[in-house]
Swiss-Prot record:
Domain of life: Eukaryota
CDD domains on file: GlyRS_alpha_core
A Pfam family the protein falls into: tRNA_synt_2f
Compartments, as annotated in UniProt: Plastid, Chloroplast; Mitochondrion
GO process terms (BP): embryo development ending in seed dormancy; glycyl-tRNA aminoacylation; regulation of embryonic development
Subunit architecture: Homodimer.
Top-rank EC class of the record's enzyme: ligase
DNA damage listed as a keyword: no
Species annotation: Arabidopsis thaliana (Mouse-ear cress)
Record-given protein name: Glycine--tRNA ligase, chloroplastic/mitochondrial 2
Principal location class: plastid
Amino acid sequence: MAILHFSLPLIVSFLRPHASPRFFLLPRSLSQSPFLSRRRFHRTSAVSSAAVHHQSYRNPDDDVTRAVSVPTFQQAIQRLQEYWASVGCAVMQPSNTEVGAGTMNPCTFLRVLGPEPWNVAYVEPSIRPDDSRYGENPNRLQRHTQFQVILKPDPGNSQQLFINSLSALGIDVTAHDIRFVEDNWESPVLGAWGLGWEIWMDGMEITQFTYFQQAGSLPLSPVSVEITYGLERIIMLLQEVDHFKKILYADGITYGELFLENEKEMSSYYLEHASVDRLQKHFDYFDEEARSLLALGLPIPAYDQLLKTSHAFNILDARGFIGVTERARYFGRMRSLARQCAQLWLATRESLGHPLGVASEPVPPVCHRAALEKVAEKVSEDPRSFIIEIGTEEMPPQDVINASEQLRVLVLELLENQRLRHGAVKAFGTPRRLVVLVDAMSSKQLEEEVEVRGPPASKAFDDEGNPTKAAEGFSRRYGVPLEKLYRKVSGKTEYVHARVTEPARLALEVLSEDLPGILAKISFPKSMRWNSSVMFSRPIRWVMALHGDLVVPFSFAGISSGNVSCGLRNTASASLLVQNAESYEDTMRNSGINIEIEERKKIILEKSNALAKSVSGRLVVPQNLLNEVANLVEAPVPLIGKFKESFLELPEELLTIVMQKHQKYFSIIDESGQLLPYFIAVANGAINEDVVKKGNEAVLRARYEDAKFFYEVDTRKRFSEFRDQLQGILFHEKLGTMLDKMNRLKKMVSKLCLALKIDEDLLPVVEDAASLAMSDLATAVVTEFTALSGIMARHYALRDGYSEQIAEALLEITLPRFSGDVIPKTDAGMVLAIGDRLDSLVGLFAAGCQPSSTNDPFGLRRISYGLVQILVEKDKNVNFKRVLELAASVQPTKVEANTVEDVYQFVTRRLEQLLVDNGVSPEVVRSVLAERGNNPCLAARTAYKTEKLSKGEMFPKIVEAYSRPTRIVRGKDVGVGVEVDENAFETPQERTLWSTYTSIKDRIHTGIEIEDFTEISMQLVEPLEDFFNNVFVMVEEERVRKNRLALLNNIANLPKGVIDLSFLPGF
């Protein structure tokens, strides 16, 4: 089979020097096969002001891009090989070891490391045991075929090269909805990550496109572009078949005839017969072998052994042996090997002198002063609009919103700081552009008189008051007559000053200097490099800046500004000449681009609602989905699609998550709130609506066929039967399986109910729910759609006749799942959620899995944050250390007291974070947690109230009142257990203070509310003031002195268990 699969004509470009290195990889006629350079080479700037990179390379006479027939599977591989060879790639061979993706082939992982250029393309059969479906699922295979491309360094037009490759496959890119949808890729095994996209065609992911930032835990320079095609998906779409086995592989033979039996037998092995014990040993053997090879200085065979460990792990995972936490441990072992292989490979290539050469960094363009002077000659006196547009490859939706507003604020600050008068300042954003438009901006600055400081007066004038050379120099520098200088004291020194009128500089000159700086200030949650020192959300490909009809000349990220923007990808107007800033909005509108975010939302809602009404339905519009979809498109085109009504028999949550999360579709419901068999997809730009609608329907059908397959597998059993399957899912090597974890939870719940003061009548419900907890982790649906954990547990429990209370608790054990998520509503769900998190925290800390400052592979920060969120929002007072000890008592390994204390401190820091996130000052938080951290609910309530009280009149007074006795007794030998002797009092102030203390001390206790503590403590303010005004504490007579210290010590200790006031301002 392997011979059939890969005995294809190859066009192999050997690595040899060529005379004329080129910047762009451009399609050439297929008879030509350019070679990759072995020499050091230099790339010119990525983009010029003429937007060279936006040229359309689609030539109707070119063999690569003209319309071609639908290819067979074999022809598709041939066409991609020929196309990428024609633009300068060497066509390589697949790995001879099982890999889960083309990324793991040494041609990618090892070759993206280091400075050597590398442009390759190859087919990679990717083995994923977890996707085994016996050939029954139409869209899932344990061995699927990727086509992998690596471009190193980024040529600057890699997106266009990819789109041209689709044309080479025979795809009409003007008819289809081709989109770049955010995908932040990472490989925990390889210590690799990058930013880029899933590339969708009519809603189906056909390719992954990534700018590698790191590999082997090492930063990459230069950055490589990875393009990974999913060939089965693409060919099914092109051949319009609904099952992989129907793909025409070559003339007269189908994919199924070649590979269906392989799918059946390998699925049987991976899912049923693979020996877990032997595979664990294999993993250890391969790991040991890799380390021995690394010690011998052999990175290539060592990496081959790493690939074998990865495949062994994947089979163990498919057998259901790897739990969430154990996964992180295996990943850590493999990541360590990957890092060592990477380091050794780099050292080896360096020792060889980098045989393929060194990729040079681009030289940034220089904004010559002469260019600015030339433009300045054309400046008019009249105010004109100013426009700046930062053109990028597709940014993530949230980045569009945040960055466009940041740019608006930064431009506004620049205008104010530089004294440039202006009208309205508006921000716009689309996936490919950040825009700020300023109305009526003046052509030059306002003049301003400012005070400038010169030399000290003692140096500016001699003893007789005559100006020195220092004064003359200062006068000359600012053009101010000597007699206009004046003296002014600053601090303890007298200086010479002068009033100076700052000249009005041209706006063009000021903007040219300052714009690069403000663009560099735009920040993103995740930024990337693309062979430039600049970090940005995605690569910047053009910059347009105009004041009126004049270009504001500057450079940023290796790009010079100009007056050219870019149109929609799938239109003829790839480049748009903007005549002046005033015409920008019309230019965009006429090209079909809607730059206003709110306007795009409005278009989506209006057209989608109309489409929903056309089928007697109502649109379901989650706000976060609308925000996302509106910023995935520049020209929204809502389309209505239909799916088979039989799919409505699946759980609504399953259908909805596929539509909304996976496909970004809006669902449609009837008047009663039931799903209708329709959806709304939002396409982008000028497309063939029938083609795109048909494609999206096919994609959703495939998704729902997957979901149906998983659901039918699950419903062959009762839900309780999945409980025993948890025995096959490892939680952690030292903590046992998920079944062991569930049993620990069962042991905890009765005592936990008592600690949380839960009604004892609810205990049977909690215990029954605990016996089923987490069972859905063994179901096929949750394995595939992990976000449905808990949701499917509730569904399957209700389906099997369990009570609503039990079913709801099975959902709520997972809550909250993320920041801002809801918390459990029922007490039964709350007990399970708290117990599960306590078990995870104590167990994993005991197993040595504490997070570091930079790494939290088990998500313990999220778990603990959710735990305190539940306790606080459910208003449950609990002795936290006691419930930690309860969790410690059921662990399979001994938990030391210091481990419990470590968990306590760790969770307390999360509580501190939660309170600060909710607006409590850090000082107040620390003061409360120092005394009440063991009861998170009471601590939070105290912190919120203290924050409010601290802004009033009463609370600062008691802070000051308690501060004086505390400071006096601090460090003094007051004596342990020394009691106050009333007979030792010598003054009425002592007696009054003691009397006040004794009247309130029993009313202040560890559970008192802070407002009551404050009100009661106010009774001490006046007696304390009288005491300190009239009584000297540290008298000579020891008996009196110690008695007074004991009195003050008793008062200083009153806040203990309530609040530590020493953390607060004014103490």
